[in-house]
């Protein structure tokens, strides 16, 4: 028996990032990695957002995030906007606070109808915090490359943690590289002991970046909110952009602000409800991993 048997779910997307949201606040039973994989086989998604009972005063829920391969993620900005949209519906609330593995995240209604803003917290740049397998004093560009030493195909990525590890390769054309080929190699490179999200990014001007991402545990994605945050921050660290930028991803646009003062990263974008349904218990027959979520 699974905690997801007969549970209602919402299939959503955050500018193309495929999200499934399940409210389990009334049922604190464990959900397993096998359950998460079973859901992905039935309702394809990039991230599964599980709302579990709040553990801290002042929070709406503890949000556990699964990738479609059954691994867990500490943060998913697009998913949090989808969660916020669901909970704001039919409510006059202006803001919500959630707990995740990466810490507390605040969400509020955006500047226009259908937009939502998530405070993703402050980025981390220390090699131990990302984490990396060896010491790098300057994470604005680390020694890592794909291809021949004298003619690398991709090289010298910036690395950032937004609650999960990100590597950003700066390129002139984000479509000139087979990210489906290089993505899994770089995601699983030994330098990243917890694997990494891999992004190709092109700086158009000081207020605009285009990007594509191979998402850790999910693969090629039309949008990755935490990658957009990491990329915007990395570009600003290099002094190549301002601290407020428009990010163009395959699935749409996000506005990212790396706020002065507290260094928190604010992400604003849309969230759409595609359909709602109920899980058939037959999906979880054989999902026998008993690791509690």
Swiss-Prot record:
What are its E.C. numbers?
5.1.1.7
Q: GO cellular component terms?
A: cytosol
Query: What keyword terms does UniProt attach to this protein?
Result: Amino-acid biosynthesis, Cytoplasm, Isomerase, Lysine biosynthesis
* S-S bonds: none
Listed under catalytic activity are: (2S,6S)-2,6-diaminopimelate = meso-2,6-diaminopimelate
Name the job this protein performs. Catalyzes the stereoinversion of LL-2,6-diaminopimelate (L,L-DAP) to meso-diaminopimelate (meso-DAP), a precursor of L-lysine and an essential component of the bacterial peptidoglycan.
State the family it belongs to: Belongs to the diaminopimelate epimerase family.
What is this protein's name?
Answer: Diaminopimelate epimerase
Its ancestry begins with:
Bacteria, Pseudomonadati, Pseudomonadota, Alphaproteobacteria, Hyphomicrobiales
């Amino acid at each position: 028996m699974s905690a997801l048997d007969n549970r209602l779910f919402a299939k959503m997307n955050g500018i193309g990032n495929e999200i499934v949201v399940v409210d389990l606040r009334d049922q604190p039973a464990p959900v397993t990695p096998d359950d998460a994989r079973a859901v992905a086989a039935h309702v394809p998604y990039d991230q599964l957002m599980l709302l579990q009972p709040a553990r801290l005063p002042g929070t709406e829920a503890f949000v556990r995030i699964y990738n479609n391969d059954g691994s867990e993620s500490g943060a998913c900005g697009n998913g949090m906007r989808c969660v916020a949209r669901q909970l704001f519906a039919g409510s006059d609330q202006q803001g919500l606070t959630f707990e995740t593995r990466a810490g507390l995240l605040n969400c509020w209604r955006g500047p226009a109808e259908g937009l939502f803003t998530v405070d993703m917290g402050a980025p981390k740049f220390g090699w131990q915090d990302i984490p990396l397998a060896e010491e790098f004093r300057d994470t604005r560009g680390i020694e890592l490359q794909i291809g021949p030493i004298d003619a690398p195909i991709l090289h010298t990525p910036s690395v950032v943690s937004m609650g999960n590890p990100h590597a950003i390769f700066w390129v002139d054309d984000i479509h000139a590289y087979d990210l489906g080929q290089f993505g899994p190699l770089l995601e699983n490179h030994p330098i990243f002991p917890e694997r990494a999200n891999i992004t190709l990014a092109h700086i158009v001007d000081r207020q605009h970046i285009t990007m594509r991402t191979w998402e850790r545990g999910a693969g090629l994605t039309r949008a990755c909110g935490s990658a957009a945050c990491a990329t915007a921050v990395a570009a600003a660290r290099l002094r190549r952009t301002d601290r407020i930028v428009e990010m163009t991803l395959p699935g749409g646009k996000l506005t990212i602000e790396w706020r002065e003062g507290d260094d928190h990263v604010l992400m604003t974008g849309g969230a759409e409800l595609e359909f709602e349904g109920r899980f058939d218990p037959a999906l979880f027959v054989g999902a026998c991993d008993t690791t509690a979520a």
